[in-house]
Swiss-Prot record:
Matching InterPro entries: Bcl-2-like_sf, Bcl-2_BH1-3, Bcl-2_fam, Bcl2-like, Bcl2_BH1_motif_CS, Bcl2_BH2_motif_CS
Motif BH2: chain residues: 126-141
Compartments in which it is found: Host mitochondrion; Host endoplasmic reticulum
Keyword Oxidoreductase recorded: no
Upregulation: Expressed in the early phase of the viral replicative cycle. Expressed in the late phase of the viral replicative cycle.
Protein name: Apoptosis regulator Bcl-2 homolog
Major subcellular site: host cell
SMART domains the record matches: BCL
Taxonomic placement: Viruses, Varidnaviria, Bamfordvirae, Nucleocytoviricota, Pokkesviricetes
Residue span of motif BH1: 76-95
Organism from which the protein derives: African swine fever virus (isolate Tick/South Africa/Pretoriuskop Pr4/1996) (ASFV)
Length: 179
């Protein structure tokens, strides 16, 4: 890798891969860079809000299923707009899917990381760079308020449920007056 490609690789590793590896316990908190420790705070908050709303379960037994389901959900999430809040939801969703694979001992967490990395590189990175890159993402993570987090979590859940056709998930969202 050279020049611009290396810069992009480093951005994705700082924002996405580091958090996923931390989330699935492949690295400890003290192994995170100072930047990663800062964004971990907002991502952990997104994760906590998401966990309060619904339990996301997966049925993944092959690399192809992971790629298909993952790409379907995140394509739906970003089909009409990219913003930092949705990117946070994307990262947390990626981490949850990787953790599921690791906990299921199916050794497919690397497929999730690779699929998420490629999606971010090809679909999100140009937007991220044109909107301030790592610095703006950090600013967003430091200054997000509870309402923007909840709004983005509700939006993510509605897209997740729409794509995955989880009737029980949709019903839960309705019962909680979230959609």
């Amino acid at each position: 890798m050279e020049g611009e490609e290396l810069i992009y690789h480093n951005i994705i590793n700082e924002i996405l891969v580091g958090y996923i590896k931390y989330y699935i316990n492949d690295i400890s908190e003290h192994e995170l860079s100072p930047y990663q420790q800062q964004i971990k705070k907002i991502l952990t908050y997104y994760d906590e809000c998401l966990n309060k709303q619904v339990t996301i379960t997966f049925s993944l037994t092959s690399a192809q299923e992971i790629k298909t389901q993952f790409t379907g959900v995140v394509t739906e999430l970003f089909k009409d707009l990219i913003n930092w809040g949705r990117i946070c939801g994307f990262i947390v969703f990626s981490a949850k899917m990787a953790k599921y694979c690791k906990d299921a001992n199916n050794h497919l967490e690397s497929t999730v990381i690779t699929t998420a990395y490629n999606f971010m590189k090809h679909n999100l990175l140009p937007w991220m760079i044109s909107h301030g890159g790592q610095e703006e993402f950090l600013a967003f993570s430091l200054h997000s308020d509870i309402y923007s987090v909840i709004f983005n979590i509700k939006y993510f859940l509605s897209k997740f449920c729409n794509h995955m056709f989880f009737r029980s998930c949709v019903q839960l969202l309705r019962n909680c007056n979230l959609i």
